[in-house]
Amino acid sequence: MAAGKTVGCFGLTEPDGGSDPGAMKTNAVRDGESYILNGRKMWITNGNIADVALVWAKNEEGRIKGFLVPTDTSGFKANKVDHKMSMRASVKSELVLDDVRVPATALLPEADGLSAPLSCLTQARYGIAWGALGALESVYDDALRFSKSRSTFDKPIAGRQLVQDKLVDMVADHTRGLLLAWRLGLMKDEGTMAYNHVSVAKRENVRSALKAARSAREILGGSGITLDYGVIRHM
């Protein structure tokens, strides 16, 4: 995967689990030198194009364990989720495991309990805290360019105080979010970053990006729902 030759996916979320991964129903039963996996995962990024899936399942003692499952293994099936109105650039899938047999060596030896997958999510959320700023910057750029070129009553709408207020809010939110993510990065390098710091940064920056996208769509008017601009992709 590091060389870009293999695609992987992270199988944690379940149809009835959502934000409660500890309630997962996917299970792994030891059978000699193998494990047999059964269950379903949902909203898995790259699921149907992956070569290998990291599947989280409960063993017979109820402990959450991680298993590396090649996607061509008998009993493994990935169904693409179509007809999405959002996240259209991201492949989402349902994973179905029906008596999927993997060797005991597929078990991640040091991953034990709910903290194992959650530690992975902390790293992902750190990236999202930064990525949301890119979305915010994109919708701001679209809104600024459009407001300068679009005129009403013989005046660019960028000169209207209401539009200016929306643009200033976007700049302020982006600046605040950038400082937050930058400080979080320093704490990460220092080893003082905690999972709650990451969760708050992700929450605040994603909230700011969504707010900016809604404001940008209002500034663009009807053009805001077209794919001529990137605003609607970030709603």
Question: Regions from the language model: what does each represent?
Answer:
Residues G4, R30-Y35, E94-V96, E110, ...:
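Alpha-helical interface subdomain recognition
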Residues G4-T13:
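A short, Trp-centered hydrophobic/proline-enriched beta-strand micro-motif
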Residues G11, M24, R40-M42, L54, ...:
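Glycine-rich, charged/polar anion/phosphate-binding loops
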Residues D16-K25:
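Active-site-adjacent elements of ketosynthase-type condensing enzymes
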Residues G17-G18, M42-N48, S86, Q123-G127:
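Glycine-rich phosphate/pyrophosphate-binding beta-alpha loops
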Residues S19, T105-A111:
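Cytochrome P450 core scaffold surrounding the K-helix E-X-X-R motif
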Residues A23, D72-R101:
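Flexible, small-/acidic-enriched active-site or ligand-binding loops
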Residues S34, R40-A78:
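A short core secondary-structure module
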